């Protein structure tokens, strides 16, 4: 459905019922699938035929939703995972192994920072972090001969730094590696990174795509634009025979879908992390209203950011929809109509203590370790999502001790502002 607008794709992509079939995407709640002959199963196990034989690898419900997300991003193929962290892990591990190196922007979600800095190190994969605002030359200086990936977020969580996608893509491609971008906060409604040079996109579908805080999931989408064969000496897992699958060469047999096919047939087979069909069904319900919700999230966030920016007890507001924000020009360039997301981060003049008093005084907004849900939620990143980071790492991630992250919901904006206003009196 490449010719349709995003609102139409959110409703119709991925699943097209035939005569007499359900209009709503069915939940295929089954682990296994029946075949009539032994040879039919052989063809599936040898990756010589398409089909389903075990839900840990593929499921019709899951695949329909993955196809929808791929279409929304403009990719050739996608896979769903059981969480956003699983998506980021698979996206990198699919093309990295012990002895390899990753370069990543420092202003990223705390869990992803730990994944790259700590967990991958245990697997023999090193990571060097660079400032998102660094020059191309400074980013390039972090690369090594064994660098396989450049990783960043379109909108950093929680610093709300807007990524200069073209700058990062240019450096990545000059060093013959793909740019992987986590597009969770922007969503394909507001930004499509492939149009600016990114090669692979990840999502925590738990956030805006779901929108109701009822399922945990992730997604990986491949643009199909990175030429793995051209750099086969680096990406031999894709360009050389896979001994665990009868010597299949993914790029030769699956072309532009090689990357996603390998992630499905190899990583899902060995590591699991597949979402349940019911979770994918719930995700699909969220996707159907994604454009409507994102528009309201952004409208409300803009009004609240303007209110906070003018309040005497607020020392600083991070929101690229504000003309005086450092990242306003990048938001105007990369984001649909300059809209970013429904998340605001800000700091009070009273610092950390004032932040705690403010948050504890809120009546409508919920203190919760979540973001991008329909209801307004708030947390203190240094104490919550980024608690495992030391002071130096917090500074690199753009997280100050007094920073507050506000995930603006789709309630009436006047009610949200009234709640914030009364809480500020106690800050």
Language-model features: where?
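PLP-dependent enzyme catalytic core of the Aspartate aminotransferase-like
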Residues: 117-118, 126-127, 145-148, 360, ...
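Conserved N-terminal alpha-helix of the aminotransferase class I/II PLP-enzyme fold
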Residues: 37-89, 111-119
